[in-house]
């Protein structure tokens, strides 16, 4: 009688999944609520200030999302190597990721600093003089922070790739506490307005990058950079990272370009419309937290399963994480839909802007329930498989 193959033990128990997911959930919640607090504090300076920050952030998000896609590529490669128990190549791929993102973010940051005004004019056209003045100040300082957020995203992605989401959560906590404290001190204490908000963000990102690089060099971390020579760019591992990072960056970039076009169109409708769109973008991210959390969890879970050759387990975990994402999105969007008329009163908006903001978020809630998870969570399962 032929022997039957022994079923492979689950790579991720329920406890292991919970241990991975809850720090990611807390990290996303921190990021979103601190982002809302940022908008809330800037709104106290005036609609021109919050409008300028919103316009620049739409451009910042486009740039950071495209560059951060490289971090996703590196995390996928590292998680697959870890699934195969090949720690040497996993470590080399991590070092190459730091090199690629370091060079890319420094280059982009310098270009944005040198050409800040032409870029803003080219993207947003003619906007109020006050909005343009604030926007240029905010964009210039934001560009300085690109290398630091790039290093943070690289380190966070690599820690998640090995199933350790606690470190990225702590780094996010440090960054957001510094950001919110810096906002309070610089915006309200020193009356620095938009410049204060930008400096608080920069300082938070510097601390987060330093913290996560320090944690990366822990002797027990299989993805630590063991030698400075490992950081020297090497064609083969870089091409593996880029083979996933570039398509992912183009996908993220196309979506963000669409949002940027909306922001550009909104900028022609006046300061109230820009402010309403800014607050709507900030508040709507609350409803995305469950989906965004599962998106981050997809990379290490599916990547390690496929790296170990466990396709059936990869399929099962994909369905599980998608189910959690869809359920969480439905509940979060329902809650925000009901509470939005109250939430909008937290911000210093005119009556006209408050009404527009509420309408925008309500429409977002209706579509998010049905399309967010399949648009943003599911693709990370494909990326984890190298697609």
Model-assigned labels for residue ranges:
Residues 50-110, 149-168, 274-340, 371-386:
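Small-residue-rich hydrophobic transmembrane alpha-helices
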Residues 1-24, 78-145, 189-246, 302-368:
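Short alpha-helical transmembrane segments in multi-pass integral membrane proteins
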Residues 8-40, 44-45, 61-73, 77, ...:
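N-terminal transmembrane alpha-helices
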Residues 19, 42-61, 93, 129-134, ...:
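Interfacial/gating helices of multi-pass transporter permease domains
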Residues 22, 38, 74-75, 115-116, ...:
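Hydrophobic/aromatic residues in alpha-helical transmembrane segments
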Residues 36-40, 110, 154-158, 177-188, ...:
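Alpha-helical transmembrane segments of multipass membrane proteins
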Residues 19-38, 141, 175, 204-208, ...:
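Transmembrane helical elements of multi-pass membrane transporters/channels
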Residues 29, 33-51, 120-129, 185-192, ...:
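Helix-terminus/linker motif at the lipid-water interface of multi-pass membrane proteins
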